[in-house]
């Protein structure tokens, strides 16, 4: 089976819906995280096995901490490799972030965009690729604190690591938009103009919250608006949170269209939804929209992976 077209992240909440889909449908592949599924058993694993027989599988890591200082988690790598091999997957990606510092942090944190960080992350990616026996892809992440020691912008950093490590680029369109709005440092469209399009081989699209559930707008003594999030004040006109719990916004759909126009091939593109699940028909409609855009901009061959 080939990994191509439009996909939807496989979640336990959606298991029955996946199994009830007709053979000819818009969802052409699924994605899971090895951290969640390597040791899963029981009915959940049985249902996943059934889905994996019908759909090609992409494997997307959450906590390998490619930007971290601790040694790579060899047990996680072994579990990831076993999952890839068991389901004959041909694709693995991870986040450009770190999530450990003398313990697991349960969040994906950014590092300074520096040449030193490029060398560090690239070497760890090469180690992962050697262990897994395949080229992996690196995903741009959403982040909420920009390091003042950075010497390059986000897309330059991503390109430099991908070139140094000789890996693919997993483009998250929603993250590009969220970072562009929150930091105002890099226009999302300029990001897409500058990304190494020849390395882009996978795309995520998702929804975001335009105002955090814990946020309230207040006025300071100078009558300036601040966003108050969990007691901290941020001098921002708005704060976008990459939640994967909402429908995709129109501005992000527009950005996906622009990405398709820029790319020489149309990569497999996955809709992420992690909670606050609507009726399955609404998710399916979003996947259909991805497929329609892929068809609209299929000016060249469609990228695929043999699985």
From Swiss-Prot:
Write down the SUPFAM superfamilies for this protein, in alphabetical order.
Answer: Xylose isomerase-like (SSF51658)
| Recorded coiled-coil stretches | none
The opening ranks of the lineage are:
Bacteria, Pseudomonadati, Pseudomonadota, Gammaproteobacteria, Pasteurellales
Looking up InterPro entries in the UniProt record yields: MbnB/TglH/ChrH, Xyl_isomerase-like_sf
Protein name as it appears in the record: UPF0276 protein HI_1600
Concerning HAMAP family, the annotation shows: UPF0276
From which residue to which does the signal peptide run? none
What Pfam families does this protein's entry cite? Answer: MbnB_TglH_ChrH (PF05114)
This chain's source organism reads Haemophilus influenzae (strain ATCC 51907 / DSM 11121 / KW20 / Rd)
Q: Which family does it belong to?
A: Belongs to the UPF0276 family.
